[in-house]
Amino acid sequence: MARYVFITGGVVSSLGKGIAAAALAALLQARGYRVRLRKLDPYLNVDPGTMSPYQHGEVFVTDDGAETDLDLGHYERFTGRSANSQDNITTGRIYRNIIERERRGDYLGATVQVIPHVTDEIKRFITTGNEEFDFVLCEIGGTVGDIEAMPFLEAIRQLGNELSRQNVIYIHLTLMPFIPSAGELKTKPTQHSVKELQSVGISPDILLVRADRSIPETERCKLSLFCNVRANAVIQALDMPTIYDVPMAYHKEGLDSEVLCAFGIDSAPPPQMDLWEDITHRIHHPEGEVTIAVVGKYTGLKDAYKSLIEAIAHGGLANKVKVNIEWIDSQLFEKENSVLALQKAHGILVPGAFGARGAEGKIRAIQFARERKIPFLGICFGMQLACIEAARNIAQIENASSSEFCETENPIVGLMTEWLKGDVLEKRTRNGDLGGSMRLGAFAAELKEESHIAKIYGMTKIVERHRHRYEVNIDYKDKLEQCGLIFSGMSPDGVLPETIEYVDHPWFIGVQYHPELKSRPFDPHPLFSSFIEAAVEQSRLV
């Protein structure tokens, strides 16, 4: 039977529950245990697919096409295990399931209430499909005290009784702020947070306390006394230079040992930390550095590009270099001198996005990369704009644009109306719902033999994750290829362009999919490894 670890947060949001859960999972995995991570989000949206990146940050897409919380990206990167649609749930999805059951008559005329019906649905989600795992780590989104989180806290309280306390533990992540005027760390916010948690019937077994400096033993003992937690189970979680330092730091503080102790496990094998030691060594002892310019639309919130940032760093790890990211707002880029902003870059990357705002700035950056022979990687929207740039500036196609922006006589990029998902034909209309209506999840692509991208992958058949509603118009393929822009990858049915490249450019690749979603620190995605390698070569030329 799986053992359950519930991770809650208090005092303030954005403390890093997702990183804490992922780091603990990595430590348990390093001891040989099979671990599953799940995220429970209290918001009423069915999923984050239609939420603004400024509101939610990145939408992380799984192989089976689920649009999920960005924390699932951390889960995958730290454990190497691919998440799926059953690893993330929201209040909106819970209520939708319940209302569908009520309409079918499944409740046999009963009055549908938060307790037991909502809490039972939450418990069903938590406990289903865990037979092959030793530990299931569940992160509860939000902060203790939020009204939206109450049904989730009640559900995990009930599970503590139903599964027995030998199979359930609670970890509470809090903040211990330093007050400069007093010159000391304060325990009171954590005390009140634990009191709030205890008021709903949950007493934490372990306190994971965030702080920007070492916590004195006297303060740890104070937290132990007032929060009713063993002194050894008050674990300091100090700020780290990078998120990949966290597993080693938590192991040093004894988090994994305390978790096993709380479950009464005293015969666990020691963790094999060689992998993490190698990663942290590469991070802190680079043999050089390069600068990558990311020309994006949501640069005001870096969480909108969380997986991209990590994948770029992974490319640096593969090449033993530090990668500095130069963020360029594509909208401002339209008004300013593009040459000055990009002159110091050893590589240029245009990531995914939606809408016309900032698109012209990205097109200017793509033109700069093409003409100056600077390594370029265009992802999703970035590939589409690379095709528009080629159509305008090389093929001289008048009014070349995307139907996403405006009505145009030459739609180089257009709305997809149908595509194959396995053996099933999926269809969409322009006026349909936005939520869940894109080409989502893992799709196969076939690469041309001897193409640059096929050499990077070392194969001609690949499977990558997608999230897009628009696609490069296949009707313009011949015209663009005559100008040197090769469609080096296509969907298996030959209808949807998947990758492009220039034959006369040292490194210029566009992909319709999102390779950043499958990159891991210990297994960098080949595209990012090759892109950073090309940037290293470029740095030697300037």
Swiss-Prot record:
Keyword hit for Chloroplast: no
Segments forming a coiled coil: none
Keyword Transferase applies: no
Region (Amidoligase domain): 1-265
Enzymatic reactions: UTP + L-glutamine + ATP + H2O = CTP + L-glutamate + ADP + phosphate + 2 H(+); L-glutamine + H2O = L-glutamate + NH4(+); UTP + NH4(+) + ATP = CTP + ADP + phosphate + 2 H(+)
Residues holding L-glutamine: Y54, A353, F381, G382, M383, Q384, E404, R469
Pathways per UniProt: Pyrimidine metabolism; CTP biosynthesis via de novo pathway; CTP from UDP: step 2/2
Keywords: ATP-binding, Glutamine amidotransferase, Ligase, Magnesium, Metal-binding, Nucleotide-binding, Pyrimidine biosynthesis
Binding site for UTP: S13, K186, T187, K188, P189, T190, Q191, K222
Enzyme nomenclature, EC number: 6.3.4.2
Residues involved in Mg(2+) binding: D71, E139
Gene Ontology MF term list: ATP binding; CTP synthase activity; glutaminase activity; identical protein binding; metal ion binding
Limits of the Glutamine amidotransferase type-1 domain: 291-541
Binding site for CTP: S13, D146, I147, E148, K186, T187, K188, P189, T190, Q191, K222
Protein family: Belongs to the CTP synthase family.
Protein name according to UniProt: CTP synthase
Organism: Bartonella tribocorum (strain CIP 105476 / IBS 506)
Lineage, top ranks: Bacteria, Pseudomonadati, Pseudomonadota, Alphaproteobacteria, Hyphomicrobiales
